[in-house]
Amino acid sequence: MAASTMSVCSSDLSYGSRVCLPGSCDSCSDSWQVDDCPESCCEPPCCAPAPCLSLVCTPVSRVSSPCCPVTCEPSPCQSGCTSSCTPSCCQQSSCQLACCASSPCQQACCVPVCCKTVCCKPVCCVSVCCGDSSCCQQSSCQSACCTSSPCQQACCVPVCCKPVCSGISSSCCQQSSCVSCVSSPCCQAVCEPSPCQSGCTSSCTPSCCQQSSCQPTCCTSSPCQQACCVPVCCVPVCCVPTCSEDSSSCCQQSSCQPACCTSSPCQHACCVPVCSGASTSCCQQSSCQPACCTASCCRSSSSVSLLCHPVCKSTCCVPVPSCGASASSCQPSCCRTASCVSLLCRPMCSRPACYSLCSGQKSSC
């Protein structure tokens, strides 16, 4: 059987569209060419006639060839295919998956899964959330939500960290361990409780508070109650987190820079004056050293140190923890000037003899 080119199968029907396979006989064991192969090396129809194939002697799948018949044999790409499949059946690779469009397969069973076979009888027919064959598809990579199926929406709980939304599944909220349903465009009126919205109710909408572990925000005008706005960063921030004068209606508290609430529902216990000069009438309360600051004791914000603690002038009264007397028994001369104050903003006395005033003794500071 001689051939002038590297044809795959002879177009002569007397050879039965046979192809020479490597290793089928000794004379052509290392070549795909059919020039030197005897007729006994050609084996029956592993490929279609030569015009349908390439010039290299390679068996071609029936499904991927335009010459292949209407039958579709199972393959790794189509493990669920039946004999009624046509070349229009879905084909897949390890990177991209496609679905059966115009084929005996129903579109309901065509749900792509990460790096898994999806065809006429896909793995979506057996799901972990419910037993019905039209149940939603779920995998460890990407999950989809069931909208028009016997499965309840409760079975749609994706385990991946990326929202998966389609145009027809807008009524089903996407939730994952990374992105909450609030930030998902497919979430409308339904809001499932999540670690991001521990206090949210079923009436929450996407306008509900959203948070992160770095910069929390609060809900201002939304159906969510203020109780659901509990950030995990620093210390909970209420209402509008800012230090400006026009937002004094609610205290901002954090471990970084707290603000003082003057006329607000917050009590003065949350007032730590660090922001503006208008907050000098609010006593500084800290776990390190409380001060009995009056209006003349605290400097303006421009004189406050880097740690945002008000320092006392030389006329400030500093209570000594070991003294039982009131703060007024301390003389102003006990406090050093601003240049002598430490970086922690603690007023310090110039001489230990000043402390004797707390016990009623006389001393010159």
From Swiss-Prot:
Cellular component annotations (GO), alphabetically ordered: cytosol; keratin filament
PANTHER family (alphabetical): KERATIN ASSOCIATED PROTEIN, KERATIN-ASSOCIATED PROTEIN 10-9
Renumbered ranges of Sequence repeats: 41-45, 46-50, 67-71, 89-93, 99-103, 109-113, 114-118, 119-123, 124-128, 129-133, 135-139, 145-149, 155-159, 160-164, 172-176, 186-190, 208-212, 218-222, 228-232, 233-237, 238-242, 250-254, 260-264, 270-274, 282-286, 292-296, 297-301, 316-320, 334-338
Disulfide bonds: none
Lineage of origin: Eukaryota, Metazoa, Chordata, Craniata, Vertebrata
InterPro entries: KAP (IPR002494)
UniProt keyword terms in alphabetical order: Keratin, Repeat
Family from the record: Belongs to the KRTAP type 10 family.
The organism of origin for this protein: Homo sapiens (Human)
Protein name per UniProt: Keratin-associated protein 10-6
Tissues expressing this chain: Restricted to a narrow region of the hair fiber cuticle, lying approximately 20 cell layers above the apex of the dermal papilla of the hair root; not detected in any other tissues.
Residue segments, region 29 X 5 AA repeats of C-C-X(3): 41-338
Pfam family, one: Keratin_B2_2
Annotated function: In the hair cortex, hair keratin intermediate filaments are embedded in an interfilamentous matrix, consisting of hair keratin-associated proteins (KRTAP), which are essential for the formation of a rigid and resistant hair shaft through their extensive disulfide bond cross-linking with abundant cysteine residues of hair keratins. The matrix proteins include the high-sulfur and high-glycine-tyrosine keratins.
Subunit and partners: Interacts with hair keratins.
